[in-house]
UniProtKB/Swiss-Prot annotation:
Any GO molecular function: symporter activity
Keyword set, alphabetical order: Amino-acid transport, Auxin signaling pathway, Cell membrane, Membrane, Symport, Transmembrane, Transmembrane helix, Transport
Organism taxonomic ancestry: Eukaryota, Viridiplantae, Streptophyta, Embryophyta, Tracheophyta
Name the record gives this protein: Auxin transporter-like protein 1
Membrane topology: Multi-pass membrane protein
Transmembrane stretches, start-end: 68-85, 88-108, 144-164, 181-201, 203-223, 241-261, 275-295, 323-343, 365-385, 387-407, 433-453
Keyword Cell membrane: yes
Function: Carrier protein involved in proton-driven auxin influx. May mediate the formation of auxin gradient from developing leaves (site of auxin biosynthesis) to tips.
Keyword check for Disulfide bond: no
Stretches of the chain found on the membrane's Cytoplasmic side: 1-67, 109-143, 202, 262-274, 344-364, 408-432
Gene Ontology annotations of biological process type: amino acid transmembrane transport; auxin-activated signaling pathway
InterPro entries to which the protein is assigned, alphabetical: AA_transpt_TM
Amino acid sequence: MVPREQAEEAIVADSNGKEEEVGVMGVSAGEHGADDHHGGGGKFSMKNLLWHGGSVWDAWFSCASNQVAQVLLTLPYSFSQLGMLSGVLLQLFYGFMGSWTAYLISVLYVEYRSRKEKEGVSFKNHVIQWFEVLDGLLGPYWKAAGLAFNCTFLLFGSVIQLIACASNIYYINDRLDKRTWTYIFGACCATTVFIPSFHNYRIWSFLGLGMTTYTAWYLAIAALLNGQAEGITHTGPTKLVLYFTGATNILYTFGGHAVTVEIMHAMWKPAKFKYIYLLATLYVFTLTLPSASAMYWAFGDELLTHSNAFSLLPKTGWRDAAVILMLIHQFITFGFACTPLYFVWEKVIGMHDTKSICLRALARLPIVVPIWFLAIIFPFFGPINSAVGALLVSFTVYIIPALAHILTYRTASARMNAAEKPPFFLPSWTGMFVLNMFIVVWVLVVGFGLGGWASMVNFIRQIDTFGLFAKCYQCPKPAPALAQSPVPLPHH
């Protein structure tokens, strides 16, 4: 087995070769295949600046912008269910736990890729995905589990972005109901089929994070300026169902690394990804903690019936700007969630190595249709996050990576020949295994068990209250018009 340094060099070499050869990734031969070009020694072009992203910074922007998105608007709702102290502590707890499992995924990717490269396998015209890593390291049953959970999570992750688009635009233009806006934004988001891979999200990731940063600080400042209305109460937590629903939404918030492998594969040096997700999470804390805390302080228990933070803030130009920027970012995040699904579908129908972007876009369109349909059936912005977090995120990005790491390195020979040794802050294999088992047990019991129970109770309650295919979820009821009949003229 190649040691860690050689494994990294092998990965870099293959990545560069891939970028020179794969036109479908948006990079042509000789354009910037050499590593010294990526370092700044080659010819500058606007196309490279905006379209070809594979640096450490590109990966950081992708992770940070993909992680926060629309959950920024539902975290105040979660704080009202949890209370201030639990809300802050659980954000920190799940943020660091998510960073650890993202690290495990990156280690397993490097292990899989270094083994395959030693066997002479080429990844030209092929994007490695998480289920393929599981297949290569642990066999077909793990591949099936990874494929099922990952694809279902990404499917509903895309659904959530579409629901959020309709929910947000309603606060600018309420002449159309949220269901109609879902139809419109479903068509708009379908244009993501033309973006070949994560390699081509450079400018979008940068803009997306900037937009989310504006929205987060708008929420915090607007809430503080609004102040506490008279009679505001902060009673959370009051019910176990609400508590674990809120906790699971936070688990969902910091479980956005279902696309980690695809982001790594788009890097010029994938082995440098290890701590990027942690650094992205630290930045995300500066957005989520102030905004959620300020909103809960200002509005308290009112948030229990307002899952979208925008709904409680006064309509101003600042709010409209935040809504518009969040809409654009949700379009970007929709693409992030859908792109791995596009890859899977391409591989199923044999179109993954097709070089024509238009043909691939046409082949991808069937993926958008079920997303569109599900967003119309379940328009429950907020509660759906918790349900997806408990039933899908708990396995996809917490339990499966932790178990996969334990089983991959369960033998002494596997540990001795590992492409990545334990990190400096936890230099013991035993320590890593103990931490992994803690994550498995915690998420299985608290996230999937209690969180699943609470989230499904809350989700079913939304169906009972609003019904499937709800036309305008949580929209304010129009004031009843006073029927004023004309006064009859006296007869003479």
